[in-house]
Amino acid sequence: MNAITSCLTAIWTSSIGKKLIVAVTGAFLVLFLAGHLVGNLVVFMGPEPFNAYAYFLHHMLHGAGIWLFRLVMIAALGLHILATLALTRENRAARKPYECQATIQASVSSRTMIVSGLTIAAFFVYHMLHFTVRSGAAAGYDTAERYLNFRLPGVEHGVHNAWQMVIDGFSVWYVSAFYIVAMLLLCSHLSHGVQSIFQTFGLRSKKASALIQLVSVAYSVFIFAGFVSIPIAILVFGFGR
């Protein structure tokens, strides 16, 4: 146990160790976003497919699967934030006065990584409260008749109407607006973050740099377009209403 503790302490106290933590957790979160987007886009297939998908997620491992994954997600996000803040503090402490001018050369995305990251973290908390915990203005999602007893083929009892919950949630303009702004910040964060992951893993070279930058930007735009298509379709074009 002491050996494990010593190893973990050595990783955390090392700049390289913290960079690896940021890269590994970042890669996990990047892959999660792709999977989460694919699942979210099922909403366009209608109530039955989306509610069947939601029912499957909430009944994996007899209901424990979704919560185990959420705990892993929270741990990954927490480590990602803590390691990034620690690295930022170390870099600022070690920076010489004349090096401050170098930030002018940096991209907007790289200079706003901390701000965009913390805003995204705040959005994550709000998103969980809204669609998972269903607290505050979303409390009715657990009690109103329209969200209860949706009938699925092969399921004896009625299930929660997650599709209707999404439609009603994004029908509120300020919820959709906050969601779109958060996705814009996420896109900015990803465009620099994905490149940093490649660099930390030693996969970025002069020859591959342009391609990695292109892939990072393309992935960020794909994620942004996919996620915001849902509130825009509902709020602007009246999908599902």
Give a label for each model feature.
Residues M1-R241:
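Membrane-embedded alpha-helical bundles that constitute the cytochrome b-like, heme-associated redox core
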